[in-house]
Amino acid sequence: MSDKNGNDQAGAPRIKLKTRLYAWWEGYDLSGLKRKGEESDAAPQPAAAAQPAAPNQGGGLNRWGKPLWTASRIEVAEKLWGKGFNTPGGQDHIPYLVKPLGLNPAMSVLDLSAGLGGTSRTMANKYGCWVTGLEASEFLAKEGMIRSFKEGLEKKAPIETYDPENFSHPKRVDAIVYKEGMFSVRGKDQLFDGMELALKPRGHLLMTDYVIEPALAGAKAVQVWCDKEPMQPHLWSKDQMAAAFAQRNLDLRIAEDITDTHRGLILSAIQGLVEHLERHHLNHETKIAVMDEVELWVRRIAAIEAGMRVCRFYALKPAE
């Protein structure tokens, strides 16, 4: 284990993740540095490299007209977060996250940020509930459905494409889970309306998302994150989120700050990835995908340290 300064419990200094990642990119041997405990806080960053311009089969584009997801990026994401996951929190984290829902085999669930389907399949496997995973990226949804087929969960945890800016669902469900997706939606009110309509009476709504107080929104690190995030963020404050629940008569039972947990998941994943990279050779395209993905999460960490928060919201729809 190590302390917050990067030293292990015996007091020996360790090389910081930034230095190790740069050394991996340049192909340096770190053994000498590890013996001497040398490190530099000012390690230069490799020049940002553009992602390949041609999208892999299907999938949407980011705000600059480049593929939002590629096979290489998915490979990196699964190394970071675990098989079937493309955001923080793998199989071990999901039970903590969804505990308020009280999931059971009689329940139907919508997962509005399905990604590769890891959360959907974890809920279906662990609790026996019937989950429909919805994902904005066509490419991710296809890859997620392939993974559901491989696990024999094509009926219990199918992954489909949808448009969060125009959300409606033909059947009412017992629960909705939406994990760090609302922040990039422009029309949050219409999405809230759609979620409320999709819930059965006494239905559950569980969301985690990035929020920020107006006084902190102008912080440099937050602005850098907003400018460079692949999908344009449209952040609300915690109070705005709470008001959206109240306006739809959804009984908000939990509105808690889980920033420290989220930050810890990111830092632990990046450290694990760096250790993996030091043992494996990757082709140039994958190395670029690694740097792009790590930089994305480092920017999110910087925004968090500048005041952006991650909150978990849990609400109940009243009986009719």
Range-by-range predicted roles:
Residues S2-K66:
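N-terminal auxiliary segments of SAM/dcSAM-dependent transferases
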Residues D3-K4, G11-L17, G32, I254-E320:
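Conserved Class I S-adenosyl-L-methionine
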Residues T87-P105:
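Conserved alpha-helix/loop element of class I SAM-dependent methyltransferases that forms part
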Residues A106-G115:
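Conserved class I S-adenosyl-L-methionine
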Residues L110, T119-E165:
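Class I SAM-dependent methyltransferase SAM/SAH-binding core
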Residues S168-I176:
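A short acidic, Gly/Pro-enriched loop at the edge of an enzyme's catalytic core
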Residues D189-H204:
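A short glycine-rich, Lys/Arg-flanked "PGG" loop and its adjoining helix->strand segment in the class I
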Residues Y210-Q232:
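Short, glycine-/aromatic-enriched active-site segment of Class I SAM-dependent methyltransferases
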